[in-house]
Amino acid sequence: MIAFISNYITFKTNRTYKNNICQLHCQSLNDNDIEARKIKEEAERRKQQAERNRMQKQMKIDRLNAIPEDAEAGTVEEFMYKDGVKEILEKLDNDLVGLVPVKSRVREIAALLVVDKLRRNLGLDTSVPSLHMCFTGAPGTGKTTVAMRMGQILQRMGYCRSGHLVVATRDDLVGQYVGHTAPKTKEVIKKAMGGVLLIDEAYYLYNASNDRDYGQESIEILLNVMEENREDLVVVLAGYKDRMDKFFSFIPGMSSRVGNHIEFPNYEAEELLSIAKVMCRDLEYEMSKDAEPIFFEYIKKRMTMPYFSNARTVRNAVDRARMRAAIRLFNQATSGNSNGLVSKKQLMTLEKEDFVSVEELIARGDNAIVE
């Protein structure tokens, strides 16, 4: 009886083993069939893709051949005038004194957009260029003005819906606690969509000494938007050149998304005098002949002192001169020796005593920030 049971167990064990072997063999064959089918399907997919590529290439050749060599899409001048690009570039020339390299770079970008539009009119291929930019330079060198004009150009050429400018800093983008940064960053992006987002002093978004800094979350959101929405949003990163270079070294993904780097040089004293004259003209004032050398000497000295900010410093000086002119005229008109009358010329002229002199500037020292 024992022998019978032993033989029966052995029989069942062998049978189970054989069944397992059979199942493994069948599974192996099935896996091989699946793998072979995948290889066949992949080969077929590649073959179909190659055929589609060939057909697309042939269609492109046929399309190009169908366009006469002497076909005209219009003149560059016509498009510059019709779309208002020429007017914007002329306004940029009038708004900004000097900055020849900056204006040349803006013209290059405008030229690319105009030529792309000419190509599109003929049915030629066009690809949306990377229009994200980096503006480097000291404060008051015209970065915000250029960003505003670029938005207008992009809108006129059909690359942005509205072309408006939104200026933001770290405080506008980065939150103070967990879960606060993403909504803030997305809200700013939402406001800028269809136009230009200028992030001033962008390097403050990244804190190398704190890997838990909330700025990293804002950067990741910006990177995604710059890639996915580049047809409807242009991001301009601005700041000092050395700090921006360091920022890009920490965030290589940001550097690869920025296709246009424009450096804004500091103004010379002569250019700052011209800027002051333009500001006065726009405000319907003018400097007297005696006032010009006073301001020129002032600005030369001011350039060597702390907190100098190029055109911003000039604007502060002009605003200060207007206040001093106002109190001068007020005192003259209310003095006992005056009939109280003030002429148009007096109301429009800034005299030398209205501007801060070099002597006053030196006496103030570091308090010159007050202008």
Swiss-Prot record:
InterPro entries: AAA+_ATPase (IPR003593), AAA_lid_6 (IPR041627), ATPase_AAA_core (IPR003959), CbxX/CfqX_mono (IPR000470), CbxX/CfxQ (IPR000641), CbxX/CfxQ_RuBisCO_ESX (IPR050773), P-loop_NTPase (IPR027417). It is found in: Plastid, Chloroplast. This is Protein cbbX homolog, chloroplastic. Residues 1-54 form a transit peptide. It comes from Guillardia theta. It comes from the Eukaryota. ATP binds at G137, A138, P139, G140, T141, G142, K143, T144. Disulfide bonds: none annotated. GO terms for molecular function: ATP binding; ATP hydrolysis activity. The keyword ATP-binding applies. Belongs to the CbxX/CfxQ family. CDD domains: AAA. The lineage of its organism: Eukaryota, Cryptophyceae, Pyrenomonadales, Geminigeraceae, Guillardia. Its main location: plastid. Seems to be necessary for the expression of RuBisCO.
